[in-house]
Structures are given as structure tokens and as C-alpha cells.
């Protein structure tokens, strides 16, 4: 598999414009990225632009704080699928995890998994920068129990992004059959190679073109 096919080509800034989404989807077609990862408002346009392409549309759920209710997250998933999303990246209820309310964390994830079942792949963002190692392990274990397809490090909107150490811990926790996505601060081919070596099977990056072409990113982002 090429590096491009492991990358979710990402544009999640709040001020993203239509012109930028059109450029993102054009690049996805050209380079063969796994997906474009966009905010829900851009799902329909992105799906139209990628009709017939190998790249699919990924969107974010309960993003970036994860503090919506399970019911709201489930609705977001259904709406996104209706608009053409094939993958959804949800943020866990981080406060509930900190409170050791594992039942709520699981119910929250399961609401998304159930809403997406058979229609969209689910990635669970645990926001590693806010967690202890014990909490990272617990979050991954709960996500697997709830039926996720992937666990993912970061939103790119908090205090830190992906590290090889966190990827290795997540991979060790979920085993070989669940995907692990590194996201947040992955900007170069070298960054990607480190993450893959640590166990990542998907990369979230706004610098996708620079990564596959070897060029320097025009403007570094946190995701």
C-alpha cells in the first residue's frame, strides 16, 4: 500500500472555504488519498466532487470537544451518511473517561457505531494529549468493546498531537485487527514513517500533498 492510500487528506479549520474544499477533493483524486476529512457542512460537496473516485469522504462527529450527548452524535452520523460520508471520526466523552464513567463512554461510542453500522467506518478519537497512559489504554479498550473500526490519537485542536509512543501503546492495546490513526502534527514523510513503524495504519494530515511529494508544507497546521 502506498503512503497516499493511508492518508486522510484533512481540512478541519473553522474558516475553511468552498474553494479550499474544491482544491482538497481535486488533490485527493490526483494523489489517491484514502479520504478527505472535512467538517460536516462540507460532506455533501465533497461527496459530489469525489463521485467515482477511489477517495471517500470522512467527517468528524462531536468535534472537537466530544462533549455532545450520545443521541446528538448518533444524529450527526446519520446526517453525514445521508450526505455521502463513508467514514466518521468521533471524539469520545473525555470528561466521562476522566470520571471513570466507563458506561457512558461506551454508550457514547456505541451510539455512533450503531448509527454507522454497515454504512460508514468508525474511528474513535481519544485525545491522547489530555490522558494518562492508563486512561489511553482504558479508552482504547472501551472503544474496541463498543465496536469501533479504528482508534485515533487526536483532534489537532487540543494541547498536542500524535506521538510514536502513543501509537505504540494504542496498537499494543487494541491488537492487530483494529486500525490505529495518527493525527495531529504529522507533517513530513519522516513523521509518517515513524508513525507507521509504531503501528499506525492511517494518517490524518492537512499536509498530505507535501508528505507524498516530499515538499515542505506551505503552512504547518496542528492536524
UniProtKB/Swiss-Prot annotation:
One GO BP on record is: carbohydrate catabolic process
One cellular component term (GO) for this entry is: cytoplasm
Q: Per UniProt, what is one GO molecular function of this protein?
A: deoxyribose-phosphate aldolase activity
The residues annotated as the active site are: 89 (proton donor/acceptor), 152 (schiff-base intermediate with acetaldehyde), 181 (proton donor/acceptor)
**Enzyme Commission number(s) from the entry:** 4.1.2.4
Where is this protein localized, as stated in its record?
Cytoplasm
Question: Which key words are in the record?
Answer: Cytoplasm, Lyase, Schiff base
Pathway(s): Carbohydrate degradation; 2-deoxy-D-ribose 1-phosphate degradation; D-glyceraldehyde 3-phosphate and acetaldehyde from 2-deoxy-alpha-D-ribose 1-phosphate: step 2/2
| Similarity comment | Belongs to the DeoC/FbaB aldolase family. DeoC type 1 subfamily.
Role noted for this protein: Catalyzes a reversible aldol reaction between acetaldehyde and D-glyceraldehyde 3-phosphate to generate 2-deoxy-D-ribose 5-phosphate.
Protein's name in the database: Deoxyribose-phosphate aldolase
Amino acid at each position: 500500500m502506498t503512503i497516499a492510500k493511508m492518508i486522510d487528506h484533512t481540512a478541519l479549520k473553522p474558516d475553511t472555504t468552498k474553494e479550499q474544499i474544491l482544491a482538497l477533493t481535486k488533490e485527493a483524486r490526483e494523489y489517491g488519498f484514502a479520504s478527505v476529512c472535512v467538517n460536516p457542512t462540507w460532506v455533501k460537496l465533497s461527496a459530489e466532487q469525489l463521485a467515482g473516485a477511489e477517495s471517500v469522504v470522512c467527517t468528524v462527529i462531536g468535534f472537537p470537544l466530544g462533549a455532545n450527548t450520545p443521541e446528538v452524535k448518533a444524529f450527526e452520523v446519520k446526517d453525514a451518511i445521508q450526505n455521502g460520508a463513508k467514514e466518521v471520526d468521533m471524539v469520545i466523552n473525555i470528561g466521562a473517561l476522566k470520571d471513570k464513567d466507563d458506561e457512558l463512554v461506551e454508550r457514547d461510542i456505541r451510539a455512533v457505531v450503531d448509527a454507522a453500522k454497515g454504512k460508514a467506518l468508525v474511528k474513535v478519537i481519544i485525545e491522547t494529549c489530555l490522558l494518562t497512559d492508563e486512561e489511553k489504554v482504558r479508552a482504547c479498550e472501551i472503544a474496541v468493546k463498543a465496536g469501533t473500526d479504528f482508534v485515533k490519537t487526536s483532534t489537532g485542536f487540543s494541547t498536542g498531537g500524535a506521538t510514536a509512543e502513543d501509537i505504540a501503546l494504542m496498537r499494543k492495546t487494541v491488537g492487530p485487527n483494529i486500525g490505529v490513526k495518527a493525527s495531529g502534527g504529522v507533517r513530513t514523510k519522516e513523521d509518517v514513517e515513524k508513525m507507521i513503524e509504531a503501528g499506525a495504519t492511517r494518517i490524518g494530515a492537512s499536509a498530505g500533498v507535501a508528505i507524498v511529494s516530499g515538499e515542505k508544507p506551505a503552512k504547518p497546521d496542528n492536524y
